[in-house]
Regions:
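Ser/Thr-rich low-complexity repeats and stalk/linker segments
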Residues: 37, 48-51
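Short, surface-exposed loop motifs enriched in S/T, G, D/E and P with embedded aromatic residues
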Residues: 50-58
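Proteolytic processing hotspots in large secreted/extracellular or virion-associated proteins
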Residues: 1-39, 43-44
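Feature responds to low-complexity, polar/acidic, surface-exposed segments characteristic
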Residues: 53, 64-89, 97-98, 102-151, ...
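C-terminal, surface-exposed recognition/capping segments
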Residues: 40, 212-225
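Exposed aromatic-hydrophobic patches
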Residues: 29-31, 62-67
Length: 263
């Protein structure tokens, strides 16, 4: 996916040959002018390509990145439907660069597409390092071998999700804003992060429409700066049952890592 836009590459050599090393153990940097649209890629021996951690240092005007699995390349952000200057551009680049989001196609991010429950759980699974589930899948609508099966199974066994009843997860269902808050809260709690912050949701005119099971999580998510109000008909509302776009969730996840994971 890096294609012809590769700007630089780096590798760890042992006796003249590229060698693998654990993620985060070797860091390199290259001089660049600006880097919101740069991403770091690891090229494995089998030819597969995966995103690795990288970040732009504006002060040094360098792009630092992990060197893993032999050769790591620096390439331009590949999505043609994520335009520089849009409110979600940095979040989409961050989520993609850190391996949290995949594109809908090699060149399409689909920022306005609605996030599904399977997509959100898969993002958190990647954030957790893609751990192998220890328990069997118990959801009747999550087939073996689907791209989200391991993520959903892991999330269920760790209390991140509990399904919608009747042994169903509804992987293709659109995730709502209050469901997003609940899932993020459960993930943070399972990792031992501080989830004590609370906001007064009554400042929003539709606070009464928040489901009882989501009140604590949405109050925390609002206090943590993850889910804020959205403007509709001149009013700032919570819109708890409203859906969330991929661009919105990318922004939420970037803030989540900054304000919760790295707090």
């Amino acid at each position: 996916q890096a294609g012809s836009a590769v700007l630089a590459n780096a590798s760890v050599l042992v006796d003249g040959a590229a060698a693998s090393c654990p993620a985060g153990s070797v860091r390199a940097a290259v001089a660049v002018n600006a880097a919101d649209d740069l991403t770091a890629w690891s090229l494995a021996d089998d030819g597969s390509i995966s995103a690795v951690s990288g970040a732009y240092d504006a002060g040094q005007q360098t792009y630092a990145f992990d060197v893993v699995n032999g050769v790591t390349a620096i390439a331009r952000f590949p999505f043609t439907d994520v335009v520089a200057g849009t409110w979600y551009y940095g979040a989409a680049a961050y989520a993609y660069n850190n391996g949290l989001f995949a594109g809908m196609t090699p060149t399409t991010f689909a920022p306005n597409a609605t996030m599904t429950r399977a997509m959100l759980v898969s993002v958190l699974w990647r954030l957790a390092g893609e751990p192998a589930p220890k328990a069997p899948n118990t959801f009747v609508d999550v087939p073996d071998g689907a791209w989200y099966t391991d993520a959903v199974t892991w999330a269920a066994e760790n209390g991140v999700v509990s399904g919608i009843g009747g042994s169903r997860f509804d992987p293709s269902g659109f995730v709502t804003r209050e469901q997003t808050a609940e899932i993020l809260y459960n993930y943070a709690h399972s990792k031992g992060y501080d989830v004590s912050a609370r906001a007064d949701l009554t400042v929003f005119p539709d606070a009464g429409s928040v489901s009882g099971w989501a009140e604590k999580a949405l109050s925390w998510a609002n206090a943590a700066g993850l889910i804020n109000g959205t403007v509709r008909d001149g009013q700032t509302i919570l819109d708890p049952q409203g859906s969330a776009s991929r661009a919105q969730v990318a922004m939420i996840l970037m803030n989540y890592v900054e304000h919760v994971v790295n707090a």
